[in-house]
Amino acid sequence: MLEAYRTHIAERAIQGIPPEPLSAEQTADLVELLKNPPTGEESTLIDLLRNRVPAGVDQAAYVKASFLSAITTGDVTSSLVSPVEATEILGTMLGGYNIEALIACLDNDDLAATAVTALSHTLLMFDAFHDVDEKAKNGNAYAMQVMQSWAAGEWFTSRKQLEDKITLTVF
């Protein structure tokens, strides 16, 4: 899988275009490599997981989120990705297949603070908003932190302030 993807990267570089993101099949192969990483490929595997799998609701994102979710629950282990790191990576997926796993992490004291940070900056919640709300109403302090963060608009206010002047060209 790694050699084939490296060949793909080289072919695209010759054309002056970036490589395509990993497909669901390539992501599944990557997951297997992450479970038993070949020596010397550790940083490449992590880079592919973090940066070459599409976020959101792509099938590759489903494979990625399922793998990371399984790490957070302890069903799967990887010497390269701890449960906290898995939660952090889930938080970079913007919304979609990662949401259910992040909400579940609110019930795990070891992962909840990381999940709060991730969910506080995630807007694409759809109906899962109600799951967080329900947890907060049932006394989950971490879910309450997420709700308070959303109410305060931290997803917006935590971003870098815009420049005083922005020059644009409109056609």
Tell me what each language-model feature is.
Residues 2-5, 133-171:
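Eukaryotic acidic, Ser/Thr-rich intrinsically disordered low-complexity regions
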Residues 4-8, 29, 44, 66-67, ...:
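Exposed alpha-helical structural elements
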Residues 8-12, 33, 48, 70, ...:
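Residues that form generic nucleotide/phosphate-binding pockets
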Residues 17-20, 42-58, 76, 80-95, ...:
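Structural detector for internal amphipathic alpha-helices that build alpha-solenoid repeat scaffolds
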Residues 37, 74, 78, 107-110, ...:
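Structural signature of alpha-solenoid helical repeat scaffolds
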Residues 39-44, 136-137:
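Short, structured secondary-structure boundary patches
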